[in-house]
């Protein structure tokens, strides 16, 4: 479990440190976001049904990350956002494992996360910095569906 938490923290720290970049996602000079436009999604008014799973994830993450001899600063919401974005590109056993850790399938989690962020009024402030960074590699194939889902929800 500690190895899983370390992996999750690495993803989130990387997403946090690199998340302030531009909206241009490119590999080998090709803009992967060509043809990808954010579609407005419906905001779920009542998030309570799946809030138990999100809270459970948060508690499990904090329990696994806390040691009496250390001070830990951790945002379960940021971790969940980073994992949710990543899970949209996973499939098979990897996706199943990620959904098990997160407590919800990505098809449920995507609209929940979108709605959570959009529930705040204009005079309240909650900003998250999310980004997807890819290693430039000629063998890398980035599916348009992955980019579209993340553009729409995150």
Predicted regions and their residues:
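Extended, solvent-exposed regulatory segments
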Residues: 5-9, 16, 20-154
